[in-house]
């Protein structure tokens, strides 16, 4: 007669090891996706909030281009003069990343940026604010969707 108890333990052991490997692989994929989303959000925000709008276009979806161009068209020389008096440029950090499939949402804290919220009035330097950015995965890249 054959002892099946040890054979069953072996199968259980391989099952547990297989499950652990699968969980680790899934976790690392999620981590790398989260990092890619975070990098895309920060890259866009750094360019956008430092008024490098042409460079920011490469970080957003084609549908968002018109909104970035509209924002750029409303910047005045007075706004640029205010921005140029600042010793430090705007800085951006991601506080939250949530994603599901090919879409993501981030909360980005932006510090020391020019806030231009009224047409016809000069912008003011804002010490910090939080913004929600939505991103879409296009091919293998994450792009901000305004």
What are these regions (language model features)?
Residues 1-27:
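Sec-dependent bacterial lipoprotein signal peptides
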Residues 15, 26-50:
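Short, low-complexity N-terminal intrinsically disordered segments enriched in polar/charged residues
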Residues 18, 83, 122-124:
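Residues embedded in well-ordered secondary-structure elements
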Residues 38-39, 53-114:
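Short solvent-exposed beta->alpha transition segments
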Residues 43, 47-51, 59-63, 138:
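Structured segments of extracytoplasmic/periplasmic soluble domains
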Residues 96-146:
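Exposed beta-sheet edge and beta->alpha loop/turn motif
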């Amino acid at each position: 007669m054959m002892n099946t108890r040890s054979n069953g333990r072996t199968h259980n052991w391989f099952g547990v090891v297989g499950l652990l490997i699968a969980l680790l692989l899934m976790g690392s994929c999620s981590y790398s996706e989260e990092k890619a989303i975070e990098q895309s959000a920060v890259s866009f925000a750094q360019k956008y909030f430092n008024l490098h709008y042409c460079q920011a276009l490469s970080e957003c979806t084609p549908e968002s281009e018109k909104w970035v161009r509209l924002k750029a068209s409303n910047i005045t020389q007075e706004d640029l003069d205010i921005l140029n008096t600042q010793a430090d440029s705007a800085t951006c950090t991601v506080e939250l990343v949530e994603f599901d499939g090919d879409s993501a949402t981030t909360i980005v804290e932006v510090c020391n940026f020019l806030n231009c919220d009224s047409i016809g009035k000069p912008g003011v330097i804002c010490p910090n604010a939080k913004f929600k950015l939505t991103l879409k995965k296009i091919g293998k890249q994450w792009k901000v969707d305004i």
